[in-house]
Structures are given as C-alpha cells and as structure tokens.
Amino acid sequence: VSGKENQDQAGGSIDRSTGKAGFRPQGGGLMTTRRSFLQGAAATGIVFCSCGMESAARAQPKPPRLPVKVGGKHVLTVDVHSHCYFHEALNLMGDTADKVLPPVKGVPEHFIVIEQRLREMDAMAIDMEILSINPFWYGKDRDTAAAIVRVQNDKLAELCASRPERFGAFASLALQFPDLAVQQLETAVKKQGLRGAAIGASVLGQDFSDPKFHPVWAKAEELGAVLFVHPQSTPELAKRFKGNGWLSNTIGNPLDTTIALQHLIFEGTLDRFPGLKVLAAHGGGFLPSYAARGDHACFVSPQNCNPDIALKKKPSEYLNQLYFDAMVFTAEGLRHLVAQVGASQIMLGTDH
C-alpha cells in the first residue's frame, strides 16, 4: 500500500471536497493495475438501511476515525468485500426469503443504520467500504429476478450521494438471463453511477466460461466494470459436506471460487476478454496456492485438454490478470498470497 496522502487501495486519489475518485492512466503491459481497477467505484455512495435514516445519521456527532499511516502519512483504506441486504428485495423472494441470509453471527447487522456502520468502520480503520450483495435470485424467473435487481440497484443509486467519501457499491445482475444482465450492467454504470457488479461463482452450476455469458463479459470489458466473484458453495457436493465443521463454507466456498477462476483461464475466456477486471473473494480460494499444478495438466494428460483452445500463456500467469481480496485470516496466509500473485493484485477485504 502506498504511503501517499489520500491514496486508496486501488491506487487512485480521492478529492475530499467532492468524494470523487481521480485515477491517472498507466502504461505498460497486459497486467491491469490497481490504479485502473476500481475506476471510480470508490466514489459511489450507499447507505445500509432502507428506513430513511440519512438525516438522523448526519445529525449524529461524527465518531473519531482511527487512521492508518505509512511513513507518517495517512493511507486511505478501501474495503472491497463488505455485505448488506435490503428488506424490500428480500420481501420479493416470497416463501424462500428466510433462506437468503447466511447462518452466521451478525447477520441481522446487515440491516443497520448508517451511523452504526460508520462506527464499526472507524473502529477497524476502514475509510471506505464497497458494498456487495451475494446473489440469491439466480433461481428466480425473469420478472422476479429483474424486480429484485431493480430494487437493489435503484436503492444504491438513490442513496449514493449520502456519504460518497465512505461508501461505494457493486451492482446486482440477473446473470441467469444474460441479455437482461447486459442491460442492467449498462444502466448501473452509465445511469446509476455504479462501477461494477457482484456475481456468484457460477449460475446454478453453469460456469462463466459458457459462451452464453460472453455478452456480459464483453459489456463489462467495454465499460471497465469490476466483476466481484463471491462464492455460493458447491451444492453438488452437499452429501460430502455433511457433518461437523460447516464444510460447505470452509471448503465449499473457496472451492467454488477456484472452479470459477480455473474455467475462465482454461477455456480461454480471459484471452477473449483480456481487459476484464475480475476480483476474487477470499483470496481467490485455493487457486493461488496450487496454480502451478495447472501449468502441468495439459502437458502430462493432453487427452484431457481441448486442442482447439490454445492459451496465450501459462495458466499460472493469468493470476496477473486477476485481483484477490486479502480475506485469508492470518498474516502468514497473506504473506503467501503476496508471494504467489504479487502485492499489486491484492485488495483489502474484510467480509464485513
């Protein structure tokens, strides 16, 4: 992380008077830089409640913020992995609404007032959070999914001016209907001021390398939109995950992300869309720790690889095109992630 005054995690600078992100272009090779990664996502505002608490929040005394300093200078900390939900969207799920929220401590706090969230952020030395909503609507029909996404994105856009210096957001997409997702992404970026989208690691088992999703990736590349990949476990392994330890989460979630990224690499999707900005949750799952195995797969077993797909570089080198949050739990885990992918590809993420 740079020690430059007002420098954010994406390498850009924030104008404190406007809350807008100013990013200077970078030259160089294919590797995307953090400076260009979020492209204004940090300037998108959001609040966490849908109960009209903005005025009350502004009337509250501002809590002291714990600063982070490097070399004696304040470093702006941007958390790219932080969650919230909207009651209005969950209400559209009907009888399945009670299955949306994950069974973890603190979930009711996803429905919180802004001043409470700010106090928590200040206590953690987080200057800015980029909000995302894990997809829970991929199994819904077109009209219901569209309504859920509309509610969520409209609310993010409607409330974006409340605290633009503290909050940003990734939009929601109905990826099960790629043509609709393209429209939603374009609206989110061009009309609603959002700069990316949060997506699952597949759409009910349909991998993102499937050509049906190419129009979505093409639009994201065109718009410079960030795609935040967050896992939803691997339900096809539910039988093996039974037992103690919540294995569907501890193993299933990172595995889900790993599979998603490997398909994007091995099916040539990242070659087809070299400018695609993909951010993987939880340090990219297991991929960074075992990427070198992929370099040998087609060499030792060519019959299991498609001769019509000629990758432009070694599979492990595609890690330089991907971004990873730092949600790996330990300092040693973070050191390992840095050693595998490089500090330039790692973003601050807390899973708050």
Feature-to-residue mapping (PLM):
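Helix-coil boundary/capping segments in enzymes
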Residues: G3-E5, I14-D15, G19-H352
